[in-house]
Amino acid sequence: MPSFLSKAFNTYFNRIAQIDQSSNSGVDATTRRLQTGDGVNTSISLSDDQLTVKPNNDDTTTTFNVSSKGGTNILEVDTTNSLVKAGVSQTNALTLYKEMGLYEFSPGGGADYHNPVIANNVGMQGAESITYDTIWGNGTDPATTLDLSAMTDPENSVAIFWLLDSNITLDQITYLARCDNSSTINMHLFAYDLDISSNHGDLSNGVVHANASVAATSTTLKKGTFTLDTANIDANKVVIGFAQNESDTADYSVHFNIKYHIR
């Protein structure tokens, strides 16, 4: 390890740490850059109450790093991608999960119609249940708009609308799927603009953010992963998951596990 012992000052002063301060009062309430002896800024700033890390030249994926004695990363701040990763798995610290699903759903409106899946924790009372509704269409993708008043059961919107309060990024969506007959089940995740001013509850500007398709059967439970079309979804959007029995009206069950992080 380098030593100052028996060395001339001009051979080691660049290795001495100092704060960016013209006076000689030392560390105080003002946060100042930590510098080398020749006045070059480091990424660290100090005061008597604060420690700040800010890149001096370039953002990097390891601007701040805490690791174990053995070198395993425990906490890492990535200023290139605006991420904080934690734990041995180095998972984004703002990672969350959202579950959606349908159980033994009967597509009584006919084959090939898109049906929204339940997104929120709601309880059904009496004979009420989530029923089919052909309003979402039977095209390749679900409808991009919704007139709430045209729904068979508009109250279902409370169960199927996932309203975002923050900007999010989708990381991965996995599914489980089963059908009473051998059928192709198509699945989508859409985001819409929500009307909160005039036609309250109506949706517009629908965009597909993820999709999947699986050959489901009655004797198997298929697991798979969605293809992400567009990962970022902005705050105040309504997110809806859909399932579609492509060629049959047999009952089916699906489960979506949505891994995402807040931006």
Language-model features: locations:
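Polar, enzyme-active/binding microenvironments
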Residues: 1, 39, 89-263
